[in-house]
Every structure is written in C-alpha cells, then in structure tokens.
Regions:
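C-terminal alpha-helical cap of glycosyltransferases
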Residues: 177-205
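A short helix/loop element that forms part of the nucleotide-sugar donor recognition site in Leloir-type
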Residues: 1-4
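Catalytic binding pocket for nucleotide-activated donors in carbohydrate/polymer assembly enzymes
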Residues: 83-167, 171-172
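Conserved donor-binding/catalytic core segment of Leloir-type glycosyltransferases
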Residues: 6-24
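Nucleotide-activated donor-binding/catalytic signature segment of Leloir-type glycosyltransferases, i.e.
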Residues: 40, 44-47, 51-80
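Conserved donor-binding loops in enzymes that form glycosidic bonds
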Residues: 16-21, 48, 72, 140
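A conserved mid-protein helix/loop that constitutes part of the nucleotide-sugar donor-binding site
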Residues: 21-34
C-alpha cells in the first residue's frame, strides 16, 4: 500500500535494492523489465545512482502503474521491503561480497543471483528433488539467463507448499562466524596435540 502497488497473491513481489549502476546488472534488468512487469511479477526497485537508468525505470513504471515502482534508497525502508518481498534480484556482474542476500534471506525473501563472487559463495540453486538450496542462480551473464532464473522462481512460487519449504530453509541459514570459529579452534587444538605427540616421540619438550 505504501508504494501504491496493486498486490496480487498470484504474482511474486520482486525487490531490487542496490546502487543503480552497470556493475549491479541494471543493463540486464532494463532488457527484460517491461516484459516482466507486464506478465509475470510486481517489482519495487530501490536505489540511487545512474540517472539514465533511473529515467528508464520511471518511464516503464508509468506505463504499468501498480506493477512497478522506483524509490530512492532508504535504509529504514529497505528492511521492510525484505520483510514484505518474495524475491530479491541480484544480477551483478561483479560482487566481491554482498550482504543484501543475507539480510533478505533472514526475512524470507529468496535471492535470484548471478553466480559470481560472494553471491556464488552464499546462494545455491534450490533443487526440486532433494529440497536443498536457498535461492536461484544463473551462470551466464545475459538477459536471457537472468529471465530464465526469474521464471524458475516464478514457477516454484505457484507451489505454496514447496515455496514455504524454501523460505523456511533460507531463514534458518546462519552465516555468522560462530560455526567457522568453532571449527578453527578444534583444528588448532588438534594441530597442537599432534605436534606435542610428535615432540614427545622425539624426546623433545
């Protein structure tokens, strides 16, 4: 309601919160955006940056009122978007780390991402057969591959039982340092023990 979207329960609400720039994949977004909002999704794009990209987004949003909205970046509102959104798109062509996908998954907003950098490390394709994975990825950096990943997510979204399973898995994932730190401590203790045993066998202290 805040963004004047005519929300439909049959269509996923797609979020994109990023600096509006080529590096974040907005060239791909604009290739498919009009087709997406005409037929398949509702979308909120949040961010500041390239005025040419923003102008094109706003132009499309005026053709499809209630389906597409652009808003400037707001840290406070970004969290509410993740909480209310179904999908987060991250079609970056470079991404050293990336935190948006981690924040979004915490709120049950499923990522669709180009498999690169930190996105590749934290997002895996959801597998229908074994029910593993936490999102949808595409490996070829092209509008067609990006569109295909969105359509895969769109099909899974129709199956509410399956979708709820995916959301539940994503929300349970932990990317804190607690687990890796525990493993490193265990590894160091094992290494120290082995060194002490080797020194003892050699008669060294």
């Amino acid at each position: 309601k805040k963004y004047d979207l005519s929300l439909s329960p049959d269509l996923p609400l797609v979020i994109m919160s990023a600096r509006i720039a080529f590096e974040k994949g907005f060239n791909l977004v604009l290739e498919i955006l009009e087709h997406l909002v005409r037929y398949n999704i509702q979308m909120i794009i949040m961010g500041d940056g390239d005025k040419n990209y923003i102008s094109q987004i706003v132009k499309i949003s005026k053709k499809y009122p209630g389906k597409l909205v652009w808003v400037p970046f707001s840290q406070k509102d970004e969290t509410s978007l993740y909480a209310g959104g179904d999908l987060l798109v991250l079609p970056s062509n470079t991404e050293p780390c990336g935190l948006n996908q981690l924040k979004a998954m915490r709120y049950g907003c499923i990522p669709i991402a180009h498999s690169i950098g930190g996105l590749k490390d934290t997002i895996t394709n959801f597998d229908f057969n074994n029910r593993e994975g936490n999102g949808f990825v595409f490996t070829n950096y092209s509008a067609l591959s990006f569109y295909g990943a969105i359509m895969r997510a769109r099909e899974y979204y129709k199956n509410k039982t399956l979708w709820n399973k995916l959301v539940s898995q994503a929300m349970r994932l932990s990317y804190s340092w607690d687990l890796p730190a525990t493993r490193y401590v265990r590894l160091f203790k094992t290494a120290i023990k082995l060194r002490q045993e080797a020194a003892s066998e050699n008669g060294q202290k």
